[in-house]
Amino acid sequence: MSEPAVVSILDTDLYKLTMLQAVLEHYPDAQVSYKYTNRSPKMALNQEAYNWLREQIRGLRNLHLLPEEEQWLRKNCPYLKESFYEFMHEFEFDPENSISLNYDSETKDLSIFIHGLWKNTIFYEIPLLALVSESYFKFVDKDWSPEGQFEKAYEKGKRLIRAGCAFTDFGTRRRRDPHTQEIVLQGLMKAQEDFKGPGSFLGTSNVYFAAKYNLNVSGTVAHEWYMGIAAITQNYKQANRIASLKWVQTFGTSLLIALTDTFSTDVFLKSFTANSADDLANVFHGVRQDSGCAEEYIEKVVKHYKSIGVDPSTKVIVHSDALNVDRCIELYKYCEKCGIKSAFGIGTNLTSDFQKVSNPSEVSKPMNIVIKLFSAEGTKAVKISDDIMKNTGDRDAVIQAKHQLCLPIA
C-alpha cells in the first residue's frame, strides 16, 4: 500500500467535531447520506488516480483518536463534552460499508455516495475531498510545483496583516496535498511573527495542523447542520431557528457564528431576532457570508441588526466565499465603512494557488468539488443559498422547499 495521505483523524475541519457533538446530543440515531459533485467536470481522474484514491479511502479505517490528540482537544476545545470522547474512543471509519465508490473508465465519471448513521458518517467529507484533489494533482495534472508556496503565503499574510484583516486558513478540503497546506501555514505563521497588526493570522480550521503547530483552531458551522434538521423536521420555515437553538443548547456561549445562506439569508433573518424568547441575534456573535454578493450582504445584515435594536459594531461578519487577498481587503474596508467587524476564512486561494510549470503566466486551476448532505431520515436534503448556481439537492425537493419558504422557483 502507498503511504497514507491522511495521517490523523483530526486532519479535518473543526466544525466536523463540533457538529458531531451536536448530532450526538440531538440526532444520535438519524440516518443520512452524502453525495459527491464535481463542479469542474473537465478535471476528471484517470485510472491510476482512482486506484490510489480507492486505496487511500480504504486506509481511513486505520485512523483512531490518539491519546495525545485527545489531550490536546481537552485543553484547547473545552466545548467538546465527555459524550464526544466516549464516542471517539469507539469510533472507527468503515469505508467498505459506508461508501459506495464507483469509477467509469470510459467517461471518467467518479461517483461517491456515503450512507449510514449521521454520527458515523459525518467525518468522511473533508478527508474524501482532500484525497480526490490530491489524487488529481498527483496523477493527472502534474504541471505544477510546490516551489515558492512558502514565499507566496508569506506575502499574502503580510498584505492581509498590514491591511487590518483578521483571517484563518479554511483550505483543507481543496488542498493540493497535506504538504502544501503545511508549507502555507508555515508562511502565514512567519508573516504573523514578522508583522504586527493591525490585522492578524488567527489560525486554521484544520485540527491536526492546529495541534501540530500550536495554532488557534477555529470553525463555525456547516450547511450540513441546517440541511439535516430541515430534512428531518420537514419544516423549512422553522429549520434555521431550530438549528440555531439546538446549537446554542449544545455550546452555550462558544462557537456562535451563524451560517445564514442555507435557505437564503432573507429567510434566515426572519428568525434572527432580538429581545424575544430566542434572542438569537444578541446571543450569536455574528454571521458567516458564503454566497451571493458580499457587499449587498453586509448592507443587509447591518440594516437588520439596526432594525432590531442590535449595535452592528458589536458583531462580526465572517467572509468565506471565494476569497483572495484583494477581495479580503475590499470587504474589510466595506465592513469598516458600514460599521461592523469582519473576519475571513480563506480556502482554495491559500492551499491550491499555483501556476503551471510549463507556463508560469498561466494559472494551474484548482478543482471545484463538494460533498453535500443528500438525505436525512429518508428525506432529500437541499441547500438554496444566496447564489442560484450554488443550489444543491434533488430538483423536486428544492422546489418543494422554495414553495414552503415563498421563494421564487426560477
Curated annotation (Swiss-Prot):
Transiently phosphorylated on a His residue during the reaction cycle. Phosphorylation strongly increases the affinity for substrates and increases the rate of nicotinate D-ribonucleotide production. Dephosphorylation regenerates the low-affinity form of the enzyme, leading to product release. Disulfide bonds: none annotated. One of its GO terms (biological process) is nicotinate nucleotide salvage. Nicotinate binds at residues 15, 170, 220. Signal peptide: none annotated. GO terms for cellular component: cytosol; mitochondrion; nucleus. Catalyzes the first step in the biosynthesis of NAD from nicotinic acid, the ATP-dependent synthesis of beta-nicotinate D-ribonucleotide from nicotinate and 5-phospho-D-ribose 1-phosphate. Helps prevent cellular oxidative stress via its role in NAD biosynthesis. Pathway: Cofactor biosynthesis; NAD(+) biosynthesis; nicotinate D-ribonucleotide from nicotinate: step 1/1. Belongs to the NAPRTase family. It is an enzyme of class 6 (ligase). The modification Phosphohistidine is found at residue 223. Its cofactor is Mg(2+); Mn(2+). Activity is highest with Mn(2+). 5-phospho-alpha-D-ribose 1-diphosphate binds at residue 348. GO terms for molecular function: metal ion binding; nicotinate phosphoribosyltransferase activity; transferase activity. This is Probable nicotinate phosphoribosyltransferase. InterPro entries: N/Namide_PRibTrfase, NAPRTase_N, Nic_PRibTrfase, Nic_PRibTrfase-Fam, Nicotinate_pribotase-like_C. Keywords: Ligase, Magnesium, Manganese, Metal-binding, Phosphoprotein, Pyridine nucleotide biosynthesis, Transferase. It holds the Pfam family NAPRTase. It catalyses: nicotinate + 5-phospho-alpha-D-ribose 1-diphosphate + ATP + H2O = nicotinate beta-D-ribonucleotide + ADP + phosphate + diphosphate. Its EC number is 6.3.4.21.
